[in-house]
């Protein structure tokens, strides 16, 4: 490993890969991510991060002030393999004290106002 010889740890390589991947994902949002971002999240009165690295995961949207993660799920997330990955990911995020809201892309397309209201309630009306 040339990187290790040059004094770069495997952890740093992993983090760089995640960082590069997050940057790529921010540049290539899905139609539903763009809709939620440009038509709702970016104008909220609190900071919303897109494609945020948390641990070894990249979450779609993260609101630190509300300890809230928002994930938009395409059809692949309904496959058994993806569901197991999502369960593991959600368990880690919950162990960090975060709340996870998951919405199917179809929900964004068919009930956008309802999704926005649900997110608003979790941010501003939490107990």
Regions found by a protein language model. Name each.
Residues 2-127:
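Nucleic-acid endo/exonuclease domains
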């Amino acid at each position: 490993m040339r990187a290790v010889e040059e004094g770069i740890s495997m952890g740093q390589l992993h983090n760089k890969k995640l960082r590069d991947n997050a940057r790529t994902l921010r540049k290539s949002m899905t139609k539903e991510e763009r809709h939620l971002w440009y038509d709702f999240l970016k104008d909220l009165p609190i900071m919303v991060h897109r494609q945020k690295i948390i641990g070894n995961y990249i979450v779609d949207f993260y609101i630190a002030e509300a300890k809230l993660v928002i994930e938009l799920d395409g059809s692949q997330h309904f496959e058994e393999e993806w569901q197991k990955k999502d369960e593991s990911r959600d368990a880690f995020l919950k162990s960090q004290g975060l709340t996870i809201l998951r919405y199917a892309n179809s929900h964004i397309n068919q009930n956008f106002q309802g999704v926005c209201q649900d997110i608003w309630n979790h941010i501003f009306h939490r107990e």
